[in-house]
Amino acid sequence: MATKFPKFSQALAQDPATRRIWYGLATAHDLESHDGMTEENLYQKIFASHFGHLAVIFLWTSGNLFHVAWQGNFEQWVLNPLKVKPIAHAIWDPHFGQPAVKAFTKGGVSYPVNIATSGVYHWWYTIGMRSNTDLYAGSLFLLFLAGVFLFAGWLHLQPKFRPGLSWFKNNESRLNHHLSGLFGFSSLAWSAHLIHVAIPEARGQHVCWDNFTKVAPHPAGLQPFFTGNWGAYAASPDTTNHIFGTSEGAGTAILTFLGGFHPQTQALWLTDIAHHHLAIGVVFIFAGHMYRTNWGIGHSLKEILDAHRPPGGRLGAGHKGIFETLTNSLHFQLGLALASLGVITSLVAQHMYALPSYAFIAKDYVTQSALYTHHQYIAGFLMVGAFAHGAIFFVRDYDPEQNKNNVLARILDHKEAIISHLSWVSLFLGFHTLGIYVHNDVVVAFGTPEKQILVEPVFAQWIQASSGKALYGFDVLLSSTNSVAANASSNIWLPGWLEAINSGKNSLFLPIGPGDFLIHHAIALALHTTTLILVKGALDARGSKLMPDKKDFGYAFPCDGPGRGGTCDISAWDAFYLSMFWMLNTIGWVTFYWHWKHITIWQGNAGQFNESSTYIMGWLRDYLWLNSSPLINGYNPFGMNSLSVWSWMFLFGHLIWATGFMFLISWRGYWQELIETLVWAHERTPLANLVRWKDKPVALSIVQARLVGLIHFTAGYIFTYAAFVIASTTGKFG
């Protein structure tokens, strides 16, 4: 007899109910809980899956390159990046009638297409690609690499090639290899690509496989490097009249410190970027030789952590025990990795528009909006995941004996103070911010807008001024013409920075006023509330005053039966579940703010945001309602247009979102009764009753139904806003 799904759990495989399927799916990735799992096997499985993950990423990127080369217009776009719309791929749809084919045929081709809003064209162009042949070559190389990684994943599961447990727990060796190899060497290699390929291409010198060994990236070759005359590589940078992709106005410098943006492309100078990656490469290769491995030299992480004990004694045993705790807990490691990656991803969202590094991407407004929104959402998911795995660490891996009186134990000891302070901050921010918004809303509604409470963000303006913004007249640090800092900047470092920050042609330090002050505090409220829920969930995961033995119930449980009526909805999983809604809410406010402020600036109408963003009706009417008109007009009595697909997605997103509430606001008994009724009807209907299933249908558990509801809520929320951002921006800027 064939074994039933799931193979990793005999107990579940023998379950007679449909619970078998749902619990099987729910625990497929909880490798620790699988039958016969050993610690060594666990590490090996996770390690092998990393290769699979990389293979999927390479396959996906290969697909992007392939479809653009095959069905896109990269070569036409390269000739005129500001006017030609970049094509992602063709659309083959049997439902398309003539109006649809006509509406979606654009970008200079004769078939219906999707327009790319991911910025890949700008990226490939900036790094030196110019032809479809380049794209095909990249695609095939990545396809080959995906195959290599799949093979490597399979290989590392074979008995002869499985690394042992001690190899996985050798922290110093791993740090050295990751710092030097992963970060250092790859940064050095990237700077080499920029210097040898991208910068020459930007100056009209084509570099390819047939000539890249013959074309020197700098006229002086390696002589300045070996003679210590490194300044030669910064001499004669591209001029402000440089036409990107040609030799007109081009210089010879390869490593510069200009600051600001290339006037034509409005992107960072490629020579600045190459310099940055070279510096990062050198620093990380150096860092990768700092930790003690086979030879008795270098740092020992255990010694460093054990020695981190402030002499005043106010942190108790300090970091003693942290080395062992971290080394032996995958959830602790994953939590830290997710938190770091989450912060970095949010920073990427910020930097991709404020300091764009790809040529002409700053002028592709739809792409700018899509990339900002995309990266902020990903950052939110990663950060919530960090706390979820932090909570699982406390439930499954935390050893109170090993961590006696150290920083971890002391955080748990004074969790009440941490939680109550976060609670107080959230309440303060919430009531004051909402109070001002509501006050402004009321006085505007009664026709006296001059009675609004408008607070100038003077501290934030002062920070902008100290970085060089002259608009506010603060005359401080970099914005003061007499200061040492300002004089030094024009001669020694980043001479282009002050011009860029005051030019008004970019998104660097945008002017801010009362509307920004209010939404900033609304976002601060949302961030602190999300953090409060997550921190409380993690710190109470082992137990709380109400339920001291919580850790014995695991990470997720609905209630401990009717005997202790107060124990419902207080598992660490419930905190994660609640925080997800707040996280989505936070990112909603962040992306609304970013998008509205930018579309008004791009339209040359910044006053609309400044005037309408100080009261709630302004947000609802002048941002959401006004900008949803292209979505509502996607289908109309005159037929369809190229935004119709986004209109449909906007509606469909609302539908998925609303479906979530069916699972979120309901009880298990209702579903069980409904299922029993459906089964009864099915078994008594001719033809239908020929199909039987062996498992007894059972309603989802409370936790599972919440998960299904949350997934619908999240997916619908994202679909709806994605369609809104792309269609409303496309409707304005094409």
Swiss-Prot record:
Pfam families: PsaA_PsaB (PF00223). One of its GO terms (biological process) is photosynthesis. The keyword Glycosyltransferase does not apply. Keywords: 4Fe-4S, Chlorophyll, Chloroplast, Chromophore, Electron transport, Iron, Iron-sulfur, Magnesium, Membrane, Metal-binding, Oxidoreductase, Photosynthesis, Photosystem I, Plastid, Thylakoid, Transmembrane, Transmembrane helix, Transport. It is an enzyme of class 1 (oxidoreductase). It catalyses: reduced [plastocyanin] + hnu + oxidized [2Fe-2S]-[ferredoxin] = oxidized [plastocyanin] + reduced [2Fe-2S]-[ferredoxin]. Chlorophyll a B3 binds at residues 662, 670. [4Fe-4S] cluster binds at residues 559, 568. GO terms for cellular component: chloroplast thylakoid membrane; photosystem I. Belongs to the PsaA/PsaB family. The PsaA/B heterodimer binds the P700 chlorophyll special pair and subsequent electron acceptors. PSI consists of a core antenna complex that captures photons, and an electron transfer chain that converts photonic excitation into a charge separation. The eukaryotic PSI reaction center is composed of at least 11 subunits. This is Photosystem I P700 chlorophyll a apoprotein A2. It comes from Rhodomonas salina (Cryptomonas salina). The gene is psaB.
